[in-house]
């Protein structure tokens, strides 16, 4: 009798253990199936909703050839070329159809109609305040003017290089430059920048920190000023904050999708003498023609050779992007 009871109890315990094992196995299998299903669902959702950042943006994200986007139906754009020229050019040409004529000429060089954009600017100083370099390849035509030689040089330094910049609060803090690649760049309708170098006791060196008139003036009524001071020394800065902003910038390297073409002048502007220009090459050329039609004809003729020394980038440059990351 006792043997039968013990057997019954043993069978009951074995059944409970077996049932528990089966339930755990089923739970593990269900967890595996559910997690796999969720993983596949998330992956498919991310793939179908993916955005190829920079590929669907006009002009800035174009590609060399036409490809089909793997996640969307739109096709990529073709390479784009922006030609920036002064108002003087269109005034001298005085032809309402001159852009269409040039577009047809660019077509003979392999640039499809609609891939070349003509951008007019009023003056070098105005263009330097808000450069808009949105195309895959950007050619900036600058008419040489001896009185604006320094402005042209600073603009070339700005647009031919990439800069990493951060805002500066000159009312609260002192600032110093850490090396040759570190510059302060001020931009605005009228920038007057004064500095007072400080010693280790934060006393002015040759100036009084409480007297702005004793500060050293390094830019006056400029629209663009790239400021270089002695490295490793704190400076108190004064500038016209109502009409100007200033940023603490580091030169990262060449912006290879931009070239500057100087029109006229006895010498080509040279920014490679700056020790921060590395490598010591530049995409600056000169054409010596008196008439703008001749200038544009020359550019059409040599456009493919010019582009060969450039590299297309998807990043664009405007004043806002320049301030934070170019």
UniProtKB/Swiss-Prot annotation:
InterPro entries the record matches: VP7, VP7_1, VP7_2
Keyword Disulfide bond carried by entry: yes
MF-aspect GO terms: metal ion binding
Binding site for Ca(2+) 2: 177, 228-229, 231, 301
Self-association state and partner proteins as the record states: Homotrimer; disulfide-linked. 2 Ca(2+) ions bound at each subunit interface in the trimer hold the trimer together. Interacts with the intermediate capsid protein VP6. Interacts with the outer capsid protein VP5*.
Binding residues for Ca(2+) 1: 95, 206, 214, 216
Post-translational modification: N-glycosylated.
Source organism of this protein record: Rotavirus A (strain RVA/Human/United States/D/1974/G1P1A[8])
Misc. comment: Some rotavirus strains are neuraminidase-sensitive and require sialic acid to attach to the cell surface. Some rotavirus strains are integrin-dependent. Some rotavirus strains depend on ganglioside for their entry into the host cell. Hsp70 also seems to be involved in the entry of some strains.
Protein name, as recorded: Outer capsid glycoprotein VP7
Region (GPR motif), start-end ranges: 253-255
Function: Calcium-binding protein that interacts with rotavirus cell receptors once the initial attachment by VP4 has been achieved. Rotavirus attachment and entry into the host cell probably involves multiple sequential contacts between the outer capsid proteins VP4 and VP7, and the cell receptors. Following entry into the host cell, low intracellular or intravesicular Ca(2+) concentration probably causes the calcium-stabilized VP7 trimers to dissociate from the virion. This step is probably necessary for the membrane-disrupting entry step and the release of VP4, which is locked onto the virion by VP7.
Keyword Magnesium annotated: no
Residues that carry a glycan: 69, 238
Signal peptide: 1-50
GO CC annotations on file: host cell endoplasmic reticulum lumen; T=13 icosahedral viral capsid; viral outer capsid
């Amino acid at each position: 009798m006792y043997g039968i009871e013990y057997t019954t109890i043993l069978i009951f315990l074995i059944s409970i253990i077996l049932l528990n094992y089966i339930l755990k196995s089923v739970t593990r299998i269900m967890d595996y199936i559910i997690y796999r299903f969720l993983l596949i669902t998330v992956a498919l959702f991310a793939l179908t909703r993916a955005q190829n950042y920079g590929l669907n943006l006009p002009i800035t994200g174009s590609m060399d050839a036409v490809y089909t986007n793997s996640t969307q139906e739109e096709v990529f754009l073709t390479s784009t070329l922006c030609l920036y020229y002064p108002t003087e050019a269109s005034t001298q040409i005085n032809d309402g159809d001159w852009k269409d004529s040039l577009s047809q000429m660019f077509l003979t060089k392999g640039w499809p109609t609609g891939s070349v954009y003509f951008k007019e600017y009023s003056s070098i100083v105005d263009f330097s305040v808000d450069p808009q370099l949105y195309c895959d390849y950007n050619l900036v035509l600058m008419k040489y003017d001896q009185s604006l030689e320094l402005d042209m040089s600073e603009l070339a330094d700005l647009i031919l290089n990439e800069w990493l910049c951060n805002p500066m609060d000159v009312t609260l803090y002192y600032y110093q430059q850490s090396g040759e690649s570190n510059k302060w760049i001020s931009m605005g309708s009228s920038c007057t920048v004064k500095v007072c170098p400080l010693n280790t006791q934060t006393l002015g060196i040759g100036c009084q920190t409480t007297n702005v008139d004793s500060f050293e003036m390094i830019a006056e009524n400029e629209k663009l000023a790239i400021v270089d001071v002695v490295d490793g020394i704190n400076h108190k800065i004064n500038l016209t904050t109502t009409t100007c902003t200033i940023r603490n910038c580091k030169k990262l390297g060449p912006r290879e999708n931009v070239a500057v073409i100087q029109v006229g002048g006895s010498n080509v502007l040279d920014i490679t003498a700056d020790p921060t220009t590395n490598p010591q090459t530049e995409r600056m050329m000169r054409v010596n023609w008196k008439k703008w039609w001749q200038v544009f004809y020359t550019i059409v003729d040599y456009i493919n050779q010019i582009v060969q020394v450039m590299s297309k980038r998807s990043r664009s440059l405007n004043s806002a992007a320049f301030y934070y990351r170019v």
